[in-house]
Amino acid sequence: MGEVDPAFIQALEHRPKLQTSFAQGIPLIDLSPLINSPEPSQQLVAEIGRACQEWGFFQVINHGVAVKARENIESAARKFFALPKEDKKKVARDEVNPLGYYDTEHTKNVRDWKEVFDFVVRDRSLIPASPDESDDQDQVKELINQWPEFPSDIREVCEEYAAEMQKLADKLLGLIALSLGLERTRFNGFFDDQTTFIRLNHYPPCPAPDLALGVGRHKDAGALTILAQDDVGGLQVKRKTDGEWVLVKPTPDSYIINVGDIIQVWSNDKYESVEHRVKVNSEKERFSIPFFHNPAHYTWVEPLEELVNDQNPAKYKPYNWGKFFSARKRSNFMKLDVENVQIQHFKNHTSLPNTE
């Protein structure tokens, strides 16, 4: 990635400002009470609920994730991305198997300034064979992890890290369920045959950080994202109060938690997924590792019945997660003539009474 190809250049209204402020007041939630007591306090549950409602994301500390597991996967990522391009492309992903290495991903039809390596947490995960709604959703294909020869321990460290992330995700989903007034285990069944995946991100230095983005503006399609970022920083979120893009300052040994679109739908818009993007740096490379927690491909996503009533009717029509996921994956490979599928496409629009 030398000169800036026009494919990377953002439309004028979406270009990042070189000077942006760090966000103030981002919730920083201490999970250490869960270490000593399996039952979370009402205070902790309320903190989680406020963060999901007011920000759509938060940071956690004292989360119980083994420090060594994170250090190992970060080291493996650096070693892998330092390989020659031809070696990385030996495990290149494609439309048939969207796992492995890729360096031409698009977000909202603009190319991202990054390279990635993806693997599923549950090897041989199933997704629909076709993203098209008209095609049979029972026709499925397997997602099979591709592992490079170097670093030699990459599979082992990735699987160890995935197990740590799974434990943290279970804790967080339990807290979010409680904050919505639901049973703590309410979400568990959706993830029995999960399509969760982990991504290793590498953002090389960019000669034109005012024109390109590491990842363009987007919301996460799944249920929950757990992000480990290095000390370089670059993650920006769109603040709900004023619509400004603000930087998330890296906090040592913390994780950033994003509410995804699925939780927005399950909560019937009580919680909202946050729009975010990644700035690039002209001098420093950046690494990050998101864990995208996704349900089984056969899940129909809709507002939960406990949260819907005559006063608060369902704001979304049900949609099939596997089809949604497959369609979003397809858009990563090519520029589309139409906007990529969004949860807004499934909104129930209440018609106004006819006054004529």
Task: Label every PLM stretch briefly.
Residues 1-356:
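Peripheral, non-catalytic segments flanking oxidoreductase cores
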